[in-house]
Amino acid sequence: DARVVLERATELAKTDLTTGMVTEFTELQGVMGKEYALLDGESPEVAEAIFEQYLPRFAGDVLPQTEAGKVLSIIDKIDNIVATFSRGLIPTGSQDPYALRRQTIGILNILLNSEWNISLRPIIVESMNLLNVPADKQDELLGQVEEFITLRLKNIFLDREVPHHVIDLLLSNNELSVADAEGLVKALLANRIDENVELVQ
């Protein structure tokens, strides 16, 4: 059962961070977690999800392939973003010491490739609650995190040469999921291609 795999992988997700191997070689986080899980008799599905939580690790890296790995990766990255923002450590200019932009793009690429029609807002809110963010600070923090994510999505669409006005129109709707935005962009681009073909003919 996918839920059972996810719950178990979540329980074991960070256990390898306490080991000497990962303390010495931080780039092995997740890699060693997977190996330790297998050695301890965990299922291959649980072990793979533990590894996949860190994917993608860099631009062009592979994305998580398992359902549990995708969910764990999204949850982990959202938690990192919310925790860092809650401490006032918001990336500015070229400064991004915690690689929050990369993590956000990773989240978006997972969603774009999975076509999951989900909203990130409940995950952000749950993360704020688990981090004990004061209630009177949550609305502001939610707005900051959502704006940060939206800007990354805008950049992804710009790289695909989606017109500015189309992106602004789509992303002005805060209730629109990443999958919804992607579907509308594809439809609009397909329509634009049809128009160009007609003009050529």
Regions picked out by a protein language model, each given a short descriptive name:
Residues D1-Q201:
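Amphipathic alpha-helical "coupling" segments that flank catalytic cores
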